[in-house]
Amino acid sequence: MSDPTPLVQIEIPSRRDMLRNIALAVTAVAGGRLKLEAAQHVHQQVKEEKKTAGTYQPKLFNKHEYATLSRLSELIVPADEVSGSAKDAGAPEFIDLLCSQNPALANIYTGGLAWLDTEMKKLSASTFVEARADQQVALLDSLVETERTTKENRQRGLMYEGTAHYIGLGSYGFQSPSDLGPGVFFFSWLRKMTVDAFYTSEIGIQDIQYKGNSVLSQFEVPRESIDFALQRSPFAKH
């Protein structure tokens, strides 16, 4: 007698499906934050590819874009006397793999990297990755300062909203104080994802003295751990 057909067919998602779902969640969740287990799944995918192929081959970015992303990651979370940089922790691979599975995220990064090159060429006649370190830092500093000023202006607008002086000015709003808006948007995403990649990696977990447990699928890295990781970044204070 043959076994009865099960009433419910359970489909186990493939690794590719899981990765795609994780990538799509990045732009679907407010703040773009990933659960620890999801982030470590991405790191594991990269680790397995390196073990099989000997190296990681970018899935989305071309050679120049990937080099730029790598440079940015080590600027955002540089190496110190305790541990390596975000580049050493696998942030470029982490971001590339997620972007390859999410068209919206891919657009943010390819557009943002192109914007950085265009802006740097105005300042130094070279692409971002070819520019001097002080020029790279200066451009990123300007993005952080613009973001801070824009937030302050927005808060000031909320304070005056509804007052007699504000009535009739609502359609004007509070605009960015410069034309760096696209860069600010991109760099905000990049900082968040670089720090996410860092503190969920083996290097990052050791650095912040947090011992992850993959069983706790709903666990989110504590705010204090994020703040600790951000302290490593010269571009986090705004």
Q: For the regions a protein language model found, what residue spans apply to each?
A:
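Flexible, low-complexity segments enriched for small/polar residues
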Residues: E48-T55, T68-L69, S73-F187, A197
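N-terminal export signals
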Residues: S2-D3, D17-Q40, R132
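Short, well-ordered alpha-helical packing segments
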Residues: R16-V26, S73, D117, L140, ...
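Long, amphipathic alpha-helical surface segments
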Residues: L158-H238
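Short alpha-helical segments used as structural interaction elements across diverse proteins
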Residues: I12-P13, D17, A133, S188
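C-terminal segment of N-terminal export signals and the immediately downstream linker at the start
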Residues: E11-R16, A30-R71
